[in-house]
Regions:
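C-terminal structural segment of proteins
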Residues: 1-161
Length: 161
């Protein structure tokens, strides 16, 4: 973030505040200069569900980052699961994310459990802000997280890094 005569760096987990009045740490006189994403062999995937995919606010969305533990790309060293359109800000799901550490990249059972945990966690923070039921949106969190996990795992396995 920059402003006249000053520049500062804010970690992403500190940038979003979950405050409806001040939803992020950027102040009115600051500009976003750059976003730095250190990948280190990690791959990501994003899935969203909307009534009309090109123009609508999503009913629910999920973003996943998976970093393999070694060059063989067998196990997960780090996972980050974030869901959007459920709360007042994107929700980083720490418990669901950490449950994948050490799991194999082809372990769909572990992905199902992480998707279950994601659904439960997101339901806690859910707000009624779109034209669908809360139950449906929670079910879709599970589906979007599971699909994003599978897509990110496939991207890791197919990457050249």
């Amino acid at each position: 973030l920059i402003r006249k005569g000053h520049e500062r760096t804010v970690d992403l987990d500190q940038f979003y505040t979950a405050d409806g009045i001040m939803p992020h740490a950027m102040e009115s006189h600051e500009l976003l200069k750059e976003i730095i994403i250190p990948l280190n062999n990690a791959q990501s995937a994003y899935k969203r569900l909307a009534y009309r995919s090109a123009i609508d606010y999503p009913i629910v969305c999920a973003g996943v980052l998976l970093r393999p533990s070694d060059a063989q790309k067998i196990q997960i060293d780090e996972a980050r699961i974030v869901v959007g359109a459920m709360g007042r800000a994107p929700l980083f799901l720490a418990q669901a994310s950490s449950s994948l550490k050490g799991k194999n990249l082809d372990d769909t059972g572990a992905f199902q459990k992480a998707a279950d945990a994601s659904m439960d966690s997101a339901a806690t923070f859910a707000v009624h802000n779109v034209g669908s039921t809360l139950e449906y949106r929670c079910d879709m969190v599970h589906l979007m997280v599971f699909r994003a996990l599978k897509a990110a795992a496939e991207a890791v396995q197919n990457s050249n890094g």
